[in-house]
Each structure stands twice: as structure tokens, then as C-alpha cells.
UniProtKB/Swiss-Prot annotation:
GO-annotated molecular function: tRNA (guanine(46)-N7)-methyltransferase activity
Species of provenance: Metamycoplasma hominis (strain ATCC 23114 / DSM 25592 / NBRC 14850 / NCTC 10111 / PG21) (Mycoplasma hominis)
Residues annotated for substrate binding in this entry: 111, 143, 181-184
Family named by the database record: Belongs to the class I-like SAM-binding methyltransferase superfamily. TrmB family.
UniProt keyword list: Methyltransferase, S-adenosyl-L-methionine, Transferase, tRNA processing
Annotated protein name in UniProt: tRNA (guanine-N(7)-)-methyltransferase
Length: 202
């Protein structure tokens, strides 16, 4: 699933009005954010389906973000934007609270000494709590069973409210508009279970 490095990606992203460059941004009240957007397959599809909602993809690396940009341009999206940055700086990016956060197939950082880098580590969860609307929700999807259990443990540690959890998203009864990411499409074809948690901080 790795993309070949594109040396022109960063320049193209910075030249596009779809890429936010000045912070904090005056985001809309109904903003939906995906952290670790990758190629943007899920988020651009959602933006196309819901033109009245603002979708923002946060991505650390320019090459996959450029793929997302090309998708958005091809679809003529006016409600989709990109931030090139790190989740650790999330609180500096927005003036207004976020309605929904998606964490999709984040790097599991499997080595024990790297546990603080996992995007469901308690320090990151507290950052999400700071930017999320009081009625907002975080959705977490992963194929990694270890990361799923780690997320549950971390959420309990900070007394977050788990609304729903399942180790088999594609065969559960939870009502959610689930659009596949590239990774999810691949794992679905392999019949790999997808873990899912919906949580809030109220």
C-alpha cells in the first residue's frame, strides 16, 4: 500500500487552495476530521456524499496527501480540505470545535518502547478531547488487534465513554455510515476482521 515518493507533492499541495496553510483556521461547526487520511479514499467519498458538511484530512506525509488532493480535484469537491501536519499539534489548527474525528488504520507502533506514539495513547486522547465538541464523537477503525485492545485500555484509563465497540465492524449492528479506506478494502477481501470503537469524553 506504500506510494512511491513524489518529490513534487509538497509543492503542489502548498499551491492548492484546498490545503490549509494559515492557522488556526475558522472551521465550520459541523467539521469532520480524519487523522491519518492517507490517500483520502474514505474522506473524499464522504465529502461527495455530503456537500453541506466540511471534511478535513490531516496527513503527516505529502505523497499520500497529494493523492487525496487529486481525488478531490477530480470530484470537484468544495467541502474538502487538507492539513499537512501532526496530530500532536491538533489544538493549534482550529478556532472552533470539531464535530467528529476519525482515526483510521493508524500505525500500530508494535514495539513496546514506542507505545507513546500510538494515536490512541492517552496523551493523544486528551488532545482530541480538547478539540472535540461537547457532543462530538471519535470513531476508531483498525485491523490490528493489539492496537484495538490498547485503545480500550487507554480509554478506560482516562475515563472516556465507550459508546460501542466491536472486533467485527463489517458484521455488527451498529448504525454508522462506514465508507471503506484503501486498507479496509484490502483487508475485507482477505476476510480480516476490522476492529471499531465509537467513543466520547462526556
Amino acid at each position: 500500500m506504500r506510494l512511491r515518493f513524489n518529490k513534487n507533492a509538497e509543492t503542489s499541495l502548498m499551491a492548492s487552495p484546498m490545503t490549509f496553510k494559515d492557522f488556526p483556521i475558522d472551521n465550520k461547526k459541523n467539521t469532520i476530521l480524519e487523522i491519518g487520511m492517507g490517500r483520502g479514499t474514505m474522506l473524499t467519498k464522504l465529502a461527495l456524499m455530503h456537500p453541506d458538511i466540511e471534511y478535513i484530512g490531516l496527513e503527516k506525509y505529502s505523497t499520500p496527501a497529494y493523492s487525496a488532493l487529486k481525488k478531490a480535484i477530480d470530484l470537484n469537491l468544495e467541502n474538502f480540505h487538507i492539513i499537512i501536519g501532526d496530530a500532536i499539534n491538533l489544538s493549534t489548527y482550529f478556532k472552533n470545535k470539531i464535530k467528529t474525528i476519525w482515526l483510521t488504520f493508524s500505525d500500530p507502533w508494535p514495539k513496546k518502547r514506542h507505545y507513546k506514539r500510538r494515536l490512541v495513547y492517552r496523551d493523544f486522547l486528551k488532545i482530541y478531547q480538547n478539540v472535540l465538541d461537547k457532543d462530538g464523537v471519535v470513531y476508531f477503525k483498525t485491523d490490528n488487534d493489539m492496537l484495538y485492545q490498547f485503545a480500550i485500555d487507554e480509554l478506560k484509563e482516562i475515563n472516556a465513554k465507550i459508546i460501542y465497540q466491536t472486533s467485527d465492524l463489517h458484521h455488527c449492528n451498529f448504525k454508522i455510515e462506514n465508507v471503506f479506506t484503501d486498507y479496509e478494502e484490502k483487508f475485507n477481501k482477505l476476510n480480516k476482521n476490522i476492529n471499531f470503537i465509537a467513543f466520547t469524553f462526556n
